[in-house]
Amino acid sequence: KYDAKDLESKLFVPERNKIIVDTYLKFVKDKRTVVFCASVNNAEQVADLFRANGIKAEAVSGAMKQSKRSKILKDYEEGNIKVLCACDLLNEGWDSPKTEVLFMARPTMSKVIYMQQLGRGTRLCEGKEYLLVFDFIDNANLFNAPLSCHRMFNIEEYVPGALVFGQGDRK
């Protein structure tokens, strides 16, 4: 778990938000994108910057009225909004198969949350061939590091054909 004030000082910097928007403009402009942000305030800041750059974007949160939130999500589904910026709200229980891009812009120590967020973009949809994920926090390296038997059992040297585990059970 992260301290909210510490996150504010580390993540809510204009330069970082600009990198997020610049990445969208350079690589995935006009693709439906979800930006997972560290807080509601952060989501609003990032959405503001997208709009300042001519991109139809909205922040969504549990703090807003249900009717407003539903309208924003409907507009996103219909393609009227290209970028959704959210904090936790869309992690689970929300499906949008048309989402083509995810921006991971919040840290998490939870593999479950990371996988839930990743799952928001993995839904199949006609015409969707792939999902692009941009990780601005490096969660991917934390949760997707390759795991081998050698690493699991602290075996430093790979020897072709050697037993990796169960060596003590041999008779």
What are these regions, as identified by a protein language model?
Residues 1, 73-75, 147-153:
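Short, surface-exposed amphipathic charged segments that create phosphate/polyanion-binding patches used
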Residues 1-34:
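Conserved interdomain linker/interface between the two RecA-like ATPase lobes of SF2 helicase motors
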